[in-house]
From Swiss-Prot:
This is Bifunctional pantoate ligase/cytidylate kinase. InterPro entries: Cytidylate_kin, Cytidylate_kinase_dom, P-loop_NTPase, Pantoate_ligase, Pantoate_ligase/cytidylate_kin, Pantoate_ligase_C, Rossmann-like_a/b/a_fold. The gene is panC/cmk. (R)-pantoate binds at Q66, Q161. Residues 283-519 are annotated as: Cytidylate kinase. One of its GO terms (cellular component) is cytosol. Pfam families: Cytidylate_kin, Pantoate_ligase. In the N-terminal section; belongs to the pantothenate synthetase family. In the C-terminal section; belongs to the cytidylate kinase family. Type 1 subfamily. The lineage of its organism: Bacteria, Bacillati, Cyanobacteriota, Cyanophyceae, Synechococcales. Catalyzes the condensation of pantoate with beta-alanine in an ATP-dependent reaction via a pantoyl-adenylate intermediate. Catalyzes the transfer of a phosphate group from ATP to either CMP or dCMP to form CDP or dCDP and ADP, respectively.
Length: 519
């Protein structure tokens, strides 16, 4: 078994030094590895296939700071040899199994401790496990400081922990990307957990009622059927389970919500079966997610959104192509766009067909003619802002866009997606770059499409004028939605932007609700 075992801080530092040209994908565990850990390691390994100079490091460190009782710490499974075998078979390159002294030289009192914000700690597990998440956060920060990985892989089973660690990494500005994987379950539906080995056969039969009840609730919610938490609690108690909590909370801030008024929330539970405490959850979602990506011309929205759609299996809608199509038709028929009567006639007769797919491709047809390539010409580009500012055009196309997105499962890009078309989108992004950067990208696109290319200074001038027109028009001007996240892409390649977008998406939409494609 060609698996490197690291025991000390010095050994870790030497290994990292040897791999300084490699990206490190880090899977932190406390040992007792099971199928859930295997999936984490396999996912980390899949990134190595995309980036050949990547390494997978798995840590095994039973963290005493996160246990409520000394007895629980002593009872935690310690199966190091089996853990190494599981990690190796799943694709790990190295195991780091440090002592407490290696992680906290001179003892924990000699180091800073992290205190989790009360708002993230007062409900669910945090309400009854005082200091637990403080201990988790403290150790994770320490591990990240020692390993300095590019990515960290965490499971969605411990959703509260995942939310806390995401905010911790964001607040501290740590240079690591979080990748989450959906809860892995055994054949009977019970989520994989190191604690499952403590269940007797009879207890196991009882506790499977927990995932069954949660799954039934999620299905009922999707079908717009009522959910009664008290009835669910009674059902669990009838199976001899002691319910610690059963709550619906917001996915990100973890505050209680009325599930009847929510589009997407977490239904979480903790139960005691005999001497074993177990957690599980489900997600209540009424429709598939919508992502709105806005931004100025030349910011790379189309390229990025296509790849983003492919990765997530979302339908891709380029709303700018719809305005380009109308602009092309107006030019083709020599119509003055300011002539309202002529424009009304052409809008009434137009048959604009957008062929959508989750492959990132979009075909544009007008009255049966494929104009997908024609609408990208400089002639159309020079006039599309003027046409897009016309009220009757926006009204017709916005209505069509809303209809296309009525069932969700879609990512749309344009100028006013998050403000006018899909103001209730689960995720809103404002993708932008400097005018200089956008001019360079525009020049590359024009060359690829076989069009003549103006100078960079001329392209920059055109882009700034396009920005002015888009931002100053009376109807649906280009603007960042109040709840949108701005992403400036200067100096980033397409893959980096897409990976960052997926990470932002995962803060809103779990893998269990909408999984990432394996491609």
């Amino acid at each position: 078994m060609n698996l490197t075992i690291l025991r000390t801080k010095t050994a870790l530092e030497d290994w990292c030094r040897q791999k300084h040209n490699h990206e490190i994908n880090f899977v932190p565990t406390m040992g007792g590895l099971h199928q859930g850990h295997q999936e984490l390691i396999k996912t980390a390994r899949s990134f190595c296939k995309r980036k050949h100079s990547s390494q997978v490091l798995v840590s095994i460190f039973i963290n005493p700071l996160q246990f409520d009782l000394e007895e629980d710490f002593k009872k935690y499974p310690r199966t190091f040899e089996n853990d190494c075998k599981i990690a190796y078979e799943a694709g790990a390159n190295a195991i780091w199994a440090p002592s407490f002294e290696s992680v906290f030289p001179n003892g924990e009192e000699a180091h800073f401790k992290i205190q989790v914000p009360f708002s993230l700690n007062k409900y669910l597990c945090g309400a009854s496990r005082e200091g637990h998440f403080d201990g988790v956060a403290t150790v994770v920060v320490r591990l990240l400081a020692l390993v300095r990985p590019n990515r960290i892989f965490l499971g969605e089973k411990d959703w509260q922990q995942l939310v806390i660690l995401r905010q911790l990494i964001n607040d501290l500005g740590l240079p690591v990307l979080i990748h989450s994987i959906p809860t892995k379950r055994d054949q009977d539906g019970l989520p994989c957990s190191s604690r499952n080995v403590n269940l007797s056969k009879e207890e196991r039969k009882k506790v499977v009622a927990l995932p069954a009840v949660l799954q039934q609730a999620a299905q009922a919610f999707q079908e717009n059927k009522p959910i009664n938490l008290n009835n669910m609690k009674t059902t669990l108690e009838e199976h001899d389970l002691k319910v610690e909590y059963l709550e619906t909370v917001d996915l990100k801030n973890l505050n209680p919500v009325n599930h009847d008024e929510s589009k997407l929330c977490l239904l979480a539970a903790a139960v005691h079966c005999g001497n074993t405490r177990l957690i599980d959850h489900g997600f209540l979602m009424k429709r598939n997610p919508i992502v709105a990506i806005d931004g100025p011309a030349g910011a790379g929205k189309s390229t990025v959104t296509k790849k983003f759609a492919q990765k997530l299996g979302l339908i891709y809608l380029d709303t700018g192509a719809m305005y380009r199509a109308v602009t092309w038709l107006i030019q083709e028929n020599n119509i003055d766009p300011q002539n309202s009567s002529e424009l009304e006639l052409i809008l009434n007769d137009i048959n604009l067909d957008i062929c959508l797919s989750n492959t990132g491709n979009q075909q544009v047809l007008i009255n049966g003619k494929d104009i997908t390539t024609l609408i990208r010409s400089p002639t159309v580009t020079s006039q599309v802002s003027l046409v897009a500012a016309i009220g009757s055009v926006r009204e017709k196309l916005t209505s069509q866009q809303k209809e296309l997105g009525s069932k969700g499962g879609l990512v749309a890009e344009g100028r006013d997606i998050g403000t006018a078309v899909f103001p209730d989108a689960e995720l809103k992004i404002f993708l932008t770059a400097t005018a200089q950067e956008r001019a360079k990208r525009r020049a590359i696109d024009l060359k690829k499409q076989g069009f003549s290319t103006p100078s960079l200074s001329e392209l920059e001038k055109q882009i700034k004028e396009r920005d002015r027109l888009d931002s100053s028009r009376e109807i649906a001007p280009l603007s960042k939605a109040k709840d949108a996240q701005e992403l400036i892409t200067d100096g980033m390649n397409i893959e980096e932007v897409v990976e960052l977008l997926i990470n932002i998406f995962r803060e809103k939409i779990p893998q269990e609700v909408w999984p990432t494609n394996a491609t």
